Each structure stands twice: as C-alpha cells, then as structure tokens.
C-alpha cells in the first residue's frame, strides 16, 4: 500500500499548539522550578503585609531571564487574594520617572488614570497615601527593571517618596520590591544616605540557570503549550543548549514559539530541527528587541548614529547626532551613558595617537541586527 502523502501534515483547522499563551512574556507558569530559596526570601519579606504590618523591602537582582519578574508575579498573585493588601507592579522601562511610577500606582489603586495634566506630584502622592491609609491597606510596590530609574536619576526620589509615605500620611504602610537586571549596578550603594537609611532591604539573588535547569523549564512549557508529541526530546535538548549559550531563558521560550509557528507554516504536526535553525537568529535577539523598543526617539537616533559611525570618537558622533536632533552636548552625554549602562553601546576611553585618551562609541551587537530592530 502506498504511503499517504498527507500523513504528518496539519489540516486547515489544526495547530501544533495546545496553548500558545504559554510562550508569551506575561505568562506565569503554574510550576516555577529552581527558584525555591529566592521565593522563600520574598515570602519572608512580604508575609507581614498579610498581618496588616509594613513588609520588609527586597532587592531581587540577577541576569536577564532568570525568573525575577515571574517570582514577583507569582507572589503578587497570591497576595492579591488577601484582604487588606494592594500590590502594584511597575515596569520601569515604561514608567521611568517618579511621577510616572506614582501615576501607575494611582491607576491601580483607583481603577482610573490620574488627569494627564494639571496635577502636581505632591497632590498625586497625597491622594495615593491617603487612600491606602483610609482603606487600612498595605501597599506593596514592585519596581521592575529599576535600573531604568537609575539611568534617569529618578530612583532615589522615587524610593524615598514611597518609603516615607507614613510620615506624610499617618497610617500609610508601604513596602517595596526592587528588581534589577543590571549586574554592574549596586542598587544599595547607588542610593544616597537618606534613602539607604529607610530602605534596608532583604536581598534575593537570581543566578543564571544551568543547562539542565533550562531544559527542565522548557520541558514544562512544551508539555503545557504544545500538543503531545509535537516536540521530541532531542529537539527540546537542542533548544536547551542554544538557550544556555545565549544566557537568557527568554530566548529559549521565544525559540519554541517561533519554531512552532514555522512548523505550522510547513503544515507539519511536529517541530523539527529545521524549524529551530530557521528561527534562532531572530529569537536570540529577543532581549535586544525589547531594549530598543523601550528607547525614546532621540535615544534610538543616537543608536542609529553610532551604527553608522562605528568606532568614532564621541565628539565626532555628537556632530552628526546634533545635526539630526538639535540636542545639546549635556543631554547627548546623558543618553550615551544610559545606552552604555543598558549594554546597547560600549563607550570606552581609548588612547588615540597624538590625541591622548578619548571616548570611542561602538555597538555591542551586530550592527545589522540592531538596525533591523530600530
């Protein structure tokens, strides 16, 4: 008997996925592996909130893609079911000023946005503090990617306002979870003395997953997100290896999603290595894509200029950048420093023949990959 040429092919209404949302960035897994000690630290710090007391503050730090945000989301999900506790997670990539942070907190507490203009920070802050005191609630705020507040020199004032809320409004109880992926940033040391004196956090370090842990976590996603048998163990193991090389779990999760879509484009019921190979180049830049997407127009303009003037002195890059944006040198330097801290560019001092030491700007990623994502 001849083999059926359509065997192993998807029908029009079929998919390799059981639940595609499993591979989205906001998905919180039911099973959260290899982070038991970090969760215990967070639970220890936040447990007083359930009893109506001010929780301990926490710094959660570690490389990108190591479960920090997921840990916070899981605990906040548990706390949200407790009476008298209000949790707010702020994405500091998006809300990178003190005013923006408190606007986000206001929106979560009141269920509507504050006026877009005409309301001072003092009034905004006062309304937030008064509301939680009047409702006798404990407010727990997570500043996710807090490094962005530091890049904008907004971290100290933001934390100070949150942690001193009880002085402005008696009865206001606020705890803060600070999440940072910048390993060169010492959050506590970077704060001035007035903030350090009231912050005094517990610390939870999220180390990079090893290859076995990565494969465990990806296997959980495959079992929940794909149809049975869609991803064979050798393919999963290969994705785990490439994820380990990339050093970011999110790369592996994105590879699985893209590979599944690629398999569907071939009408295949299974994800093969050819699908992984076809999508890996795009998926491995997932962190770069998100970083670039969060930049302002002027910051993106500077990235583009550095790509075009690769290896030029900072002064020469500024001349081109200034022609395009009209920004002054002080603001230019601030943007250079931010992009350097984000790991988008390398702004190093080098010895130049006959010119002494000067700052040279280079991209830290392949220029073609950067320009494609701007």
Swiss-Prot record:
InterPro entries in alphabetical order: AAA_16, Cdc6_C, Cdc6_lid, ORC1/CDC6, Orc1/Cdc6_arc, P-loop_NTPase, WH-like_DNA-bd_sf, WH_DNA-bd_sf
Q: What does this protein do?
A: Involved in regulation of DNA replication.
Give me the residues that bind ATP, please.
66-70, 209, 221
**Which SMART domains does this entry report, sorted A to Z?**
Cdc6_C
Give this protein's Gene Ontology molecular function annotations. Answer: ATP binding
- What name does UniProt use for this protein? ORC1-type DNA replication protein 6
Q: What GO biological process, any one, is recorded here? A: DNA replication
Assigned protein family: Belongs to the CDC6/cdc18 family.
CDD domains per the UniProt record, alphabetical: AAA
Pfam families annotated for this entry? AAA_16 (PF13191), Cdc6_lid (PF22703)
| Phenotypic consequence of gene deletion | Not essential for normal growth.
Q: Does the keyword Iron-sulfur apply?
A: no
Q: Which UniProt keywords apply?
A: ATP-binding, DNA replication, Nucleotide-binding
